[in-house]
């Protein structure tokens, strides 16, 4: 490892990595870091690096560059931390991928469906990273797996507050992640499943149904299977939601990261044919503060409207109150004694409540439903996209929105989220 100064006054450090080691680094706030592979071969979360190409990582990025055979890399810019580690679970993750690939080959041979894998564990154990790794390795072998995102706090297939699925056709971009060309997305409306667990489980079942339908008509998708990312809530109703997801998707393999108790509970409660595997988390996994999570969510939403590093220009326009119908999924909890005869609190959680446009809508995100009419179940209908309310004019009965596409809105049914986005940058 050597340090040198370059012309841009950015500190430049060269690292020599031995086989099966990884360089871990975090980018300082308000800084960016460039990474270049000089010799050998290396990968980031399963995506191979191109030699002599500079990759840029922005503030807050936490990156691990792994090499199977040894390499030399160069970092330019200020890192909060940068070190090489020999202690990495990559071999175990590769073994998991190899076992899944064997299952795909068997499925191909026997005209059956491929493995459906669910990755579970508490918060901050690297679930999304393991999903990305397994998907990248599969797609590099010519597979076309489906990525299912059940983590409403992260929303890596779309934005936070949603659940969705993405057909993976190429490895994730080193800087941008997976190409989100045509995801299937459902509105949940909040960043924690606990706000409406009945709706959460219903959307999980809906996603599983749609995935099954796709597998019936697309042999390649069926053989390639799916990788399911889940929330870090693993107790009580959160645990029950995991069991429900495993059942809805008829999963074959559950990868449990870093929690033996959860591993034993799932082994006990899931059908005997489900293979449950306990894997360690990587030493590079960092605990994220609430503020950091909030910033990541904001950044995710900003990227939806403005594109990666601001490559899009969103549209602002007025929408008449009379042109749209706005709903919230789930009525407020009321005492059981006040509920209509034969109705339970659970029914209340799926109820569509009309929302009257008002100033309290400002900064709220709205999902634009693909539904043609309310006779369709809005909570189980996918969404076309999202808008954010920037102002409300009660006098003229219009509200102004930020939208990724120009007017008019494709449909007139909107679902309001609890999530707010302030466009301050």
From Swiss-Prot:
It catalyses: a 5'-end dephospho-2'-deoxyribonucleoside-DNA + ATP = a 5'-end 5'-phospho-2'-deoxyribonucleoside-DNA + ADP + H(+); a 5'-end dephospho-ribonucleoside-RNA + ATP = a 5'-end 5'-phospho-ribonucleoside-RNA + ADP + H(+). Pfam families: Clp1 (PF06807), CLP1_N (PF16573), CLP1_P (PF16575). PANTHER family: CLEAVAGE/POLYADENYLATION FACTOR IA SUBUNIT CLP1P, POLYRIBONUCLEOTIDE 5'-HYDROXYL-KINASE CLP1. This is Polyribonucleotide 5'-hydroxyl-kinase Clp1. It is found in: Nucleus. One of its GO terms (molecular function) is ATP-dependent polydeoxyribonucleotide 5'-hydroxyl-kinase activity. Keywords: ATP-binding, Disease variant, Kinase, Magnesium, Manganese, mRNA processing, Neurodegeneration, Nickel, Nucleotide-binding, Nucleus, Transferase, tRNA processing. Belongs to the Clp1 family. Clp1 subfamily. Changing residue 151 to A: Abrogates complementation of tRNA splicing activity in yeast. It is linked to Pontocerebellar hypoplasia 10: A form of pontocerebellar hypoplasia, a disorder characterized by structural defects of the pons and cerebellum, evident upon brain imaging. PCH10 features include cortical dysgenesis marked by a simplified gyral pattern, cortical atrophy, mild or focal cerebellar vermian volume loss, delayed myelination, progressive microcephaly, global growth and developmental delays, severe intellectual disabilities, and seizures refractory to treatment. Its EC number is 2.7.1.78. One of its GO terms (biological process) is mRNA 3'-end processing. ATP binds at residues 22, 62, 124-129. Changing residue 140 to H: In PCH10; decreases kinase activity, impairs formation of the tRNA splicing endonuclease complex and impairs ability to mediate tRNA splicing and maturation. Gene3D superfamilies: Clp1, DNA binding domain, P-loop containing nucleotide triphosphate hydrolases, Pre-mRNA cleavage complex subunit Clp1, C-terminal domain. Its cofactor is Mg(2+); Mn(2+); Ni(2+). HAMAP family: Clp1. Polynucleotide kinase that can phosphorylate the 5'-hydroxyl groups of double-stranded RNA (dsRNA), single-stranded RNA (ssRNA), double-stranded DNA (dsDNA) and double-stranded DNA:RNA hybrids. dsRNA is phosphorylated more efficiently than dsDNA, and the RNA component of a DNA:RNA hybrid is phosphorylated more efficiently than the DNA component. Plays a key role in both tRNA splicing and mRNA 3'-end formation. CDD domains: SIMIBI. GO terms for cellular component: cytosol; mRNA cleavage factor complex; nucleoplasm; nucleus; tRNA-intron endonuclease complex. Component of the tRNA splicing endonuclease complex, composed of CLP1, TSEN2, TSEN15, TSEN34 and TSEN54. Component of pre-mRNA cleavage complex II (CF-II). Also associates with numerous components of the pre-mRNA cleavage complex I (CF-I/CFIm), including NUDT21, CPSF2, CPSF3, CPSF6 and CPSF7. Interacts with CSTF2 and SYMPK.
């Amino acid at each position: 490892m050597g340090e040198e100064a370059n012309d841009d006054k950015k500190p430049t450090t060269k690292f020599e990595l031995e086989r099966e080691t990884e360089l871990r680094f975090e980018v300082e706030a308000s800084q960016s870091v460039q990474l270049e592979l000089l010799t050998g071969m290396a990968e980031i979360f399963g995506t191979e690096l191109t030699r002599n190409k500079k990759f840029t990582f922005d503030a807050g990025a936490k990156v691990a560059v792994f090499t199977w055979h040894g390499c030399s890399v160069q970092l330019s810019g200020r890192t909060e931390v940068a070190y090489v580690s020999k202690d990495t679970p990559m071999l175990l993750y590769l073994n998991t991928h190899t076992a899944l690939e064997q299952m795909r080959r068997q499925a191909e041979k026997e005209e059956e469906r491929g493995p459906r894998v669910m990755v579970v564990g508490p918060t901050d154990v690297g679930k999304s990273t393991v999903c990305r790794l397994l998907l990248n390795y599969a797609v590099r072998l010519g597979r076309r797996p489906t990525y299912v995102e059940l983590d409403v706090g992260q929303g890596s297939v779309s934005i936070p507050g949603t659940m969705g699925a993405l057909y993976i056709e190429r490895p994730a971009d080193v800087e941008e992640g997976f190409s989100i060309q045509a995801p299937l997305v459902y509105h949940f409306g909040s960043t924690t499943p606990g706000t409406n667990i009945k709706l959460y489980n219903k959307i999980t079942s809906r996603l599983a149904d749609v995935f099954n339908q796709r597998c019936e008509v697309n042999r390649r998708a069926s053989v390639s299977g799916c990788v399911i990312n889940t929330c870090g809530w693993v107790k009580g109703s959160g645990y029950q939601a995991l069991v429900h997801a495993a059942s809805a998707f008829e999963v074959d393999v559950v990868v449990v990261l870093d929690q033996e108790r959860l591993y034993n509970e799932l082994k006990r409660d899931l059908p005997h044919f489900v293979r449950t595997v306990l894997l360690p988390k990587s030493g590079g996994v960092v605990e994220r503060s609430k503020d950091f999570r909030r910033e990541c969510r904001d950044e995710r939403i900003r990227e939806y409207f403005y594109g990666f590093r601001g490559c899009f220009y969103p549209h602002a326009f007025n929408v008449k109150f009379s042109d749209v119908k706005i709903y919230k999924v789930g009525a407020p909890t009321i005492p059981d004694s006040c509920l209509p005869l034969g109705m339970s609190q659970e029914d209340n959680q799926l109820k569509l409540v009309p929302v009257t446009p008002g100033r309290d809508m400002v900064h709220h995100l709205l999902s634009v439903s693909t539904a043609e009419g309310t006779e369709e179940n809005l909570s189980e209908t996918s969404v076309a996209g999202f808008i954010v309310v920037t102002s409300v004019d009660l006098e003229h009965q219009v509200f102004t929105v930020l939208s990724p596409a120009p007017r008019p809105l494709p449909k007139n049914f909107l679902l309001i989220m609890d999530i707010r986005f302030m466009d301050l940058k």
